[in-house]
From Swiss-Prot:
It is found in: Secreted. This is Grammistin Gs B. Has lytic activity, but has no substantial hemolytic activity. Has antibacterial activity with a broad spectrum against various species of bacteria including both Gram-positive and Gram-negative groups. One of its GO terms (cellular component) is extracellular region. Keywords: Antibiotic, Antimicrobial, Cytolysis, Secreted.
């Protein structure tokens, strides 16, 4: 899963 990556992509 890559939920954390998507979360960071939304922040930046």
């Amino acid at each position: 899963i890559g939920g954390i990556i998507s979360f960071f992509k939304r922040l930046f």
